[in-house]
Regions:
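Charged, low-complexity interaction regions
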Residues: 19-28, 40-50, 63-71
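Small side chains
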Residues: 27, 31, 37, 55-56, ...
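Intrinsic low-complexity/disordered segments
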Residues: 4, 25, 32, 39-41, ...
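Generic L/I/V-rich hydrophobic alpha-helical segments across diverse proteins
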Residues: 10, 34-38, 49-53, 82
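N-terminal non-cleavable signal-anchor helices
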Residues: 7, 18, 41-42, 80
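Intrinsic low-complexity, intrinsically disordered segments enriched in polar/basic residues
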Residues: 3, 12, 16-18, 48, ...
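Amphipathic alpha-helical binding modules
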Residues: 54-96
Length: 96
């Protein structure tokens, strides 16, 4: 998979989780990305943001030592940049 394929799959997962309150992050990467995604779309999509944050929180309740700073998530390459995450996820959430 290319970096764009990985990014696209992660955005699709964020979009799906944002619309379904019962989801939980599957791993550390998802939990940290969901947390960031929740923060960057909160003003435009408060309901979806809440779903993402809850999915992240459920994972971190079982794995509290796996929470990373925003800078570390970007450094690891899980997110290219916060503005890019916001723009691309907002587009997916808007057009569904």
């Amino acid at each position: 998979m290319t970096a764009r394929d990985v990014e696209s799959a992660l955005l699709a997962r964020c979009s799906a989780v944002a619309r379904e309150a019962t989801q939980t992050a599957q791993d550390q990467k998802e939990a940290n990305v969901f947390q960031l995604a929740a923060m960057v779309v909160q003003s435009q999509f408060p309901t979806e943001s809440k779903c993402l944050m809850q999915a992240s929180d459920r994972y971190f309740a079982a794995h509290p030592n796996e929470r990373l700073s925003s800078a570390e998530v970007v450094r690891r390459g899980w997110v290219m940049s916060l503005p890019r995450l916001r723009d691309m996820l907002s587009r997916q959430l808007h057009w569904g």
